[in-house]
Structures are given as C-alpha cells and as structure tokens.
C-alpha cells in the first residue's frame, strides 16, 4: 500500500510545491511498454512465419510450373490453363531468372569434359560439312549432341545442319527452340526461329488436315462392314497389349488375346500381369458404354476410369488420389495436398469452350500430357492418361490410337521434352500414332488382302507375312507393319 505524502511545513509554502510521489501501482509506463514489446515481437514472428510459408509454397509451385510447355504449337493460354494469371506472372519471372542462372552455372568436372569434347566434335563436324562430307559430319553432330544435349551452341549448329543439309526444318526448329529455352537471349537462335516457326506451324496444320481426311474416309465405311468389325476387334486387343506393355507387362499379343477371349490364366505369368489386362478391358468397356457419349468429362469420370484400370491390381488405390509424394524420373509431380485444386483446374480446362476449338489431336495430346504431368495416382497414371486421350479422340470420330510398346523410349523422351518446355514433339508423336492407327483400319477395310496386320513377334514371322502380300501396295503395308513390329528407327 502506498503512503500518502505528509503536508508541507509552513516555511515550505513559500517554495515551489512538488507533485506527491506515485506508488508503483499508479505508474502505468513499465506495464504498457512491456505489452508493446510483446505485441511487436509477436507481430514480427507472425509476419516472418507467413512470409516463409508463402515463399515456400510459391517456390514449390514454381518448381512445378517450370516443367510446363511454352511451345508455339499451341497457344499459351491453352498450355497454362491449369494455373492462375498471378501464378503465370510469377512463373515468368522465376523462369527467366532460373534459365539465365542455369546458363552461367558451374558444371561438374565430368560435364566440363563432355562439353569440351562435344565442342571439339562440333568444330570437326562443321569442317566436314563445309568439305562436303555430309555423312561423317552428321555422325559427329549426333555425337556432340549425345555428349552435351543441353548446350545451346550444339543445339543451334546441329539445327542449322538439319535445316540446310537434311531439309528437316521441323526437327531443326525443335533444336532452335531448345536452345532458346536454355539461352533466351541467343540472337542466332532467335533469328533462326523467326525464320522457321511459321513454316513449321503451317506444316503441322497441314498434317492435321491430312489426319482429318483419313478420319473422314474411315467414317464413310459403314458399321456393318465385316472387315471393319474385324479391324476394330483386332485393334482392341492391340490397344490393350501395347498400353500395358509400355508399363512393363511381358504378355505377348497372343497371350493378351487369349486372356480376353477365354478368361483363362497363362502359365508362367504373374497375377498382376493378368489383372492389368483385365483392368484395361474394364476401362475400355466403360469408355465405350459411357464416356464417349458424355458432353463433359469430370473428375468423377477420371476417377471411375482409374478405378477400373487398377481395380484388379490394387482395388484400395483404384479411383483414389494418391496420399504420398511420388517421383517420376527427373520429374517431381505436385504434392498430394495440391491434387484436388489442380484436378479441378484441369477439369475446367478440359471442358472449357476454348479447348473445344482445338484440333482433336492437339486437344487429346495436351489432355494426356496435363494429366500425366499432375500424376494424381499412385499407379496407373500413364494408362489412365492414354485412355482419356483416346476418349477425346473417339468423341471426335477418330479410332482409339495405338502407341506401340516398341516406341516406349520415344514416348517417354517426348514427354520429357514437354517437361523441358516444348510439347510440340509429343503432339507430333501422337499425330504419327494416330495416322498409323488410321492406316491400319483403312488397310484392313480396303480391297487389299483382308487379313488384318498382326504384331509379329519375330523378324522371321514378319518376313513370312510380307512374302504373302501380293499387291502393288506392299511398300505401304510394309511401312505400317514396320511401325508396329520393329520399334527401331524413326516412324516411317
């Protein structure tokens, strides 16, 4: 308790009076200062925590965004439709900085050795090219590219060689694009792309028009045509055989057909390999009975598709988004916490008015890439993405496209190129597979021998089959068969 001040003595009345002393309880300054300090510290901690979490989330998203394509083949708004405008602006700033940083980044000793050897091979290749020794020059250019596949100078010079010597302007433009992805300020690559981009786009558009013509020719064949029915049945078996084969299934085409027709097990093969085939069968029947007739494709439809794909192999995970982080080679898909939002955005893009104006092959290939890039499932992402792609193609009058398992390495290579920034090679690959599938149907329903091309298991069988073909169009049929059988070299 505070004591009161004593009354002043009479002499002190003539002096200045002073204020009476305050007790500790009556002085608010220390307590108020203490509260202000606590408030400042708490506010600072809260602001720092919010900034750290926001920055971490943004950086994580940008790590995912930098995989998305920036190709000329499809418009930017189509390629980035999964993300908001704010994220795209952030992506652009991050991407420009990360690319410029990567150009000047230090290399490991092994990488430096490879680059040095690649540049040496590049100089020799250019000298041989000027000397008219094109074959040797081509081999050295390829050697340089193998040693330093992401060096701007190697990409640029090899592209120029392909454009001017090999007359392959499409592949040349692809390498110019890659060079600009790594070194955006490369003036020579910019000049080359300005020269080639419109030409390549025109070639791509003409290719799509050709596919439409073949689709229309196939559509003109009546459904009652016996050859068409047999072709559809054979293509059904081939589609399942190749799609599971891409994922590592070792069943032969004959074994796949036997399982689907008899439902009997094949000796020496695992239960999972049997169930993968049965799951694809269920999913394709679901597409034919339901999805093809639907106007919009929803997340629920995709989950139902996946539930059938994985239903026999892993019924617990079938039709469910993954709950753990997964890693796919050099690609790190989004975390499980972001899948719901990303799939909602994917669904909006899938059913948007503008997406419906894309060419069906562009639309289907891009949908395939977007879904496999999000990688929403623990397993079965590739099979589900290919089934979704074929659903979209079938709605546009195309048959389900067969991606041969012998082309597996190219398939994954083009997906990797899409992750690195250029989706056009992947779209062209899907266009190639679409054309070969159309050719398969047209060949089977033509006046040529009515035996449907099978996927030959050995070279000797292929030779025997080709020897039986008696027609002026042997070369054309040989090209079709080679695409499905050998899996070697470029797509004919």
Swiss-Prot record:
Record domain Fido: where: 297-432
GO cellular component annotations of the record: plasma membrane
Membrane topology: Single-pass membrane protein
InterPro entries: Fido, Fido-like_dom_sf, Fido_containing, TPR-like_helical_dom_sf
Keyword Nucleotidyltransferase (UniProt): yes
Composition bias, Low complexity: 1-17
Chemical reaction(s) catalysed: L-tyrosyl-[protein] + ATP = O-(5'-adenylyl)-L-tyrosyl-[protein] + diphosphate; L-threonyl-[protein] + ATP = 3-O-(5'-adenylyl)-L-threonyl-[protein] + diphosphate; 3-O-(5'-adenylyl)-L-threonyl-[protein] + H2O = L-threonyl-[protein] + AMP + H(+)
Keywords, comma-separated and alphabetical: ATP-binding, Hydrolase, Membrane, Nucleotide-binding, Nucleotidyltransferase, Repeat, TPR repeat, Transferase, Transmembrane, Transmembrane helix
One Pfam assignment: Fic
Extent of motif Inhibitory (S/T)XXXE(G/N) motif: 243-248
Transmembrane segments: 33-55
Entry similarity comment: Belongs to the fic family.
Domain comment as written in the entry: The fido domain mediates the adenylyltransferase activity.
Subunit structure: Homodimer.
Name of this protein: Protein adenylyltransferase Fic
């Amino acid at each position: 308790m505070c004591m009161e001040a004593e009354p002043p003595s009479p002499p002190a009345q003539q002096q200045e009076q002073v204020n009476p002393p305050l007790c500790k309880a009556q002085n608010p300054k220390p307590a108020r200062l203490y509260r202000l300090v606590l408030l400042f510290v708490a506010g600072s901690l809260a602001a720092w925590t919010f900034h750290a979490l926001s920055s971490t989330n943004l950086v994580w998203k940008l790590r995912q965004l930098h995989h998305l394509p920036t190709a000329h083949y499809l418009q930017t708004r189509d390629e980035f439709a999964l993300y908001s405008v704010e994220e795209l602006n952030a992506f652009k700033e991050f991407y420009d900085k990360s690319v410029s940083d990567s150009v000047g980044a230090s290399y490991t000793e092994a990488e430096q050795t490879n680059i040095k050897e690649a540049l040496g091979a590049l100089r020799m290749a250019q000298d041989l090219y000027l000397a008219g020794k094109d074959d040797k020059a081509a081999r050295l250019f390829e050697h340089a590219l193998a040693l330093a596949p992401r060096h701007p100078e190697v990409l640029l010079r090899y592209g120029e060689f392909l454009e001017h010597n090999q007359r392959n302007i499409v592949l040349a433009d692809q390498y110019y694009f890659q060079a600009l992805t790594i070194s955006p300020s490369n003036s020579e690559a910019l000049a080359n792309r300005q020269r080639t981009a419109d030409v390549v786009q025109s070639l791509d558009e003409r290719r799509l028009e050709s596919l439409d013509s073949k689709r229309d020719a196939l559509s003109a064949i009546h459904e009652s045509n016996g050859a068409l029915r047999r072709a559809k049945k054979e293509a059904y078996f081939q589609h399942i055989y190749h799609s599971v084969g891409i994922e590592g299934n070792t069943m032969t085409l004959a074994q796949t057909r036997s399982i689907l027709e008899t439902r009997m097990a094949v000796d020496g093969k695992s239960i999972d390999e049997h169930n993968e085939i049965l799951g694809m069968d269920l999913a394709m029947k679901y597409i034919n009975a339901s999805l093809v007739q639907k106007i919009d494709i929803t997340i629920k439809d995709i989950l139902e598709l996946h539930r059938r794909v994985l239903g026999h192999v892993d019924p617990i995970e079938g039709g469910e988004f993954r709950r753990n982080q997964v890693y796919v080679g050099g690609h790190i898909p989004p975390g499980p916490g972001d899948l719901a939002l990303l799939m909602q955005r994917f669904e909006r893009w899938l059913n948007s008015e503008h997406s419906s104006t894309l060419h069906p092959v562009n639309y289907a290939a891009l949908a395939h890439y977007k879904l496999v890039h999000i990688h929403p499932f623990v397993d079965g992402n590739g099979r589900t993405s290919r089934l979704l792609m074929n659903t979209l193609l079938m709605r546009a009058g195309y048959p389900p496209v067969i991606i041969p398992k012998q082309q597996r390495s190219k398939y994954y290579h083009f997906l990797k190129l899409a992750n690195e920034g250029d989706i056009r090679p992947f779209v062209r690959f899907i266009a190639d597979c679409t054309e070969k599938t159309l050719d398969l149907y047209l060949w089977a329903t033509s006046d040529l021998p009515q035996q449907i091309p099978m996927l030959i298991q050995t070279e000797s069988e292929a030779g025997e089959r080709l020897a039986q073909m008696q027609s002026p169009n042997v070369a054309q049929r040989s090209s079709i068969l080679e695409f499905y059988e050998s899996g070697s070299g470029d797509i004919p």
